[in-house]
Amino acid sequence: MLGFCGAPFTLASYMIEGQSSRNYENTKAFMLGQPAAFDRLVDRIVDNSLPYLAMQVEAGADAVQIFDSWGGSLDARTWRERMLKPVTRLVKNTQELGVPVILYVNGCSHLLELLVETGADVLSIDWRIDPAEAIRRTEGKVAFQGNLDPVTLFAPPEVVQQEALRTIAAFKDAPGYIFNLGSGILPKTPLESTTALWETVLKPQGSTN
């Protein structure tokens, strides 16, 4: 069973913007114009996320995933200055509960080395980064999850099967790999392709039945 929570930047952006945003103008303006206040908000988010995750672990969660849907909109310098410390605190304190932590940052190709610094056990990555590059840059320090483009599921089932197997094979040299999409499943995704995907993934590798 997988527990989850939103990451500090994503939750802060929803609080400040009031909705999804393309450019996060209000959030970034607040972060740049009132950095101390922004940091206090982020710390408060972490303070409240920790007991929320603890309750999920107590209820039986075997692992926890932290979702930063919008964190990739930050450049590497800003992510290091504003997000590295609070996200690391969230990761480390959750690991102390005895469960592994998966960290997902959408659009993370420019942040990989920083994400490793958080100490997360697994990095969940989107489809924009080559698996071999991700493995090389993280130097065997983390396992991976994800990487398949959700739009793939709109292709014919046989193509979906091929792409799933290709993705799994691409991570053969990683310390570990959890198959998943590189982002959330899209509305109107064809059921037959979804079924083909999971039948392929759940079949023991090398099996022909």
What are these regions (language model features)?
Residues 1-209:
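Active-site loop segments of alpha/beta catalytic cores
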